Each structure stands twice: as structure tokens, then as C-alpha cells.
Amino acid sequence: LIAQKHGGTIDKYIGDAMMVFFGDPDSEGEREDARACVRMSLEMQDKIKDLQKKWRNEGFADPFEVRMGINTGYCNVGNFGSEQRLTYTVIGGEVNVAQRLEAAAEPNGILISYETYAHAQDLIDVEPKGAIQMKGINRDIKTFAILNRVVKNQQGAAPESEKSEDYLIKETNLDQAE
């Protein structure tokens, strides 16, 4: 599955929705988990486009559409429920934000929060969609629609921001070794 390939945990299916979370049981850190989730969503979006094209060619006039919402933040993860029925899941306000981002996304679109954008901005081109208020959330949520992934330059080099971050990570690791 695409989600598992990128390190995601498939939490549950809710009607026609699928909930995937990153960071547990194994985490690469908040930044890398957010980036993995963005990569997963882009691969899922590509696969859906391929399926939609195939189904149209097979005569299905209106193949289904997919919306994705991604938020980054801390949640409670574990076994919840009663002794008779425990469920390994993720709960919390940040989960609610992700669900509401999904509901607000355009058909076949990916809507992300600023918290996710901050970690993955060098991977994607986005369109700012403004801040939205969500019932039960005590802050406005800045949103961005993912337009596409950032393409490497003709020589295959990564964007400059990615290079400098790699350098900073290496420099930090060297400092810790002293």
C-alpha cells in the first residue's frame, strides 16, 4: 500500500474515507514525518488520476473524486476503548483539524495546514488559501492547496533550500560529536 510504503499507519476507514497517521509506532521526527505524509499524498493523487483516466476510458462518466487534508501536530496515540474493545488509534485536536482540511479541500485536491507547509515547502508548489475558522479549534488555521511537487533542476540537483538544510543537519551532528 502507498501509505505503508511512506511510513504511514492506516488507522481506520470511515465510510469512504481513510485515515492515515505518521510518527507512530516509528517516527523520523516531526519534519520528516510531515514530509513523508506529503510525499504519500502526492503519490496517492497520481494513482487516483491514473485510475480516473482508466475508468473514463472504460465508460465510467464520473469516476470518484478524492480529497486529502494534512495537518502536523502532536496527538494522543495508543489503545483506546474498553477492555472488550480496544482500538489502536490517534485522537486529539490536530486530528480534527486534518479531517476538516480534508472536508474543505477541492475535489482531487490536497489541502494542508501551515504547520505541514513549514516542513515541506521545498517539496511542493502551493496556493495560499487563507485562514479558516473551525468549530472547536481555538485558532485560525492557515491553509495551502498543493498544486504540484517541486521538480529538480536539469542537472538533477535538489532545490537550494534542501541542500542548505542537509548541510545544517550535518553541521549540527558534528557539533554534537565534539
What are these regions (language model features)?
Residues C75, A104-A177:
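Cytosolic regulatory/linker segments at or just downstream of nucleotide-handling modules
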Residues I10-K12:
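A short pre-motif secondary-structure segment
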Residues I14-V20:
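Short, conserved phosphate-binding/catalytic loop or strand-edge motifs used
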Residues N79-S82:
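Cytochrome P450 core scaffold surrounding the K-helix E-X-X-R motif
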Residues L1-G8, D24-M68, T72, G93-V95, ...:
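Alpha-helical scaffold within the catalytic cores of cyclic-nucleotide enzymes
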Residues M18, P25, N71-N76, T116-Y117:
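Short, internal active-site loops enriched in acidic
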